[in-house]
Amino acid sequence: MAFGNNKFIGSGEEGAIQISDNGSACSTPTGLGSRTLEKTLNGITFGNNQFLTVGSDGWLSITSDDGDGFTALTIPTGAKHLYSTAYGNDIFVAVGDDSVVVYDKDGLLDPVLKANKYSFNDVTFGNGVFVAVGNDEIIYTSTDGDDWTQVHGK
């Protein structure tokens, strides 16, 4: 679930996407939201006047500021299941199984840490830093989505 430009947007199984202006009355947006996908959408975030969804098999899709008209993005080589996404410092960062994917303001997708032995389950952004967490109590931080530092874990 994400909120941006006065809209709530939720995502889920089989590519389901729902949009609401008030948090109760929902509708299905056009584009990806209006059809069934063979992908589970695990996470969604808002940034740079866009919503980004992430899901199974490295699935990524982006929308305009109104939450309508989702468009599939090219899945980077090596990207696996993605579970969470965050926006900060003019980039989107998505994390998942052995995968960190960066979608920057120029629209380029670059897989980062795709060979990492850890599976990241969640990512957030605050105070100028991305923080990704995963199995075995690992925590990594990054300011640019490219260079990651392990700050905790086994």
Regions found by a protein language model. Give the residues of each.
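Residue-level hotspots at or immediately adjacent to binding/recognition sites across diverse folds
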Residues: M1-K154
